[in-house]
Amino acid sequence: MPKMKTHRGSAKRFKRTGSGKLKRRHGFTSHMFANKSQKQKRKLRKSAMVSAGDFKRIRQMVAKMK
């Protein structure tokens, strides 16, 4: 059985925290900023954690990632 390869697209989008959780960026941040409020744009700048339901699936794709 061959080794599991790290999904390179996922490895570039997620970072592992010290406690083992996965950190991600918010969506809706590439264009159309005139239609978003200042509060919404400020909140989108911060990073977020991957939810528990998605974590199980993403963990397999980035298993070897540090």
Swiss-Prot record:
Q: What is this protein called?
A: Large ribosomal subunit protein bL35
Q: Name one GO molecular function term.
A: structural constituent of ribosome
Entry-linked SUPFAM superfamilies = L35p-like
Quote the biased-composition stretches of kind Basic residues, using this chain's numbering: 1-28
Q: Entry's PROSITE patterns?
A: RIBOSOMAL_L35
**Any GO BP annotation:** translation
PANTHER family hit by this protein? 54S RIBOSOMAL PROTEIN BL35M (PTHR33343), LARGE RIBOSOMAL SUBUNIT PROTEIN BL35M (PTHR33343:SF1)
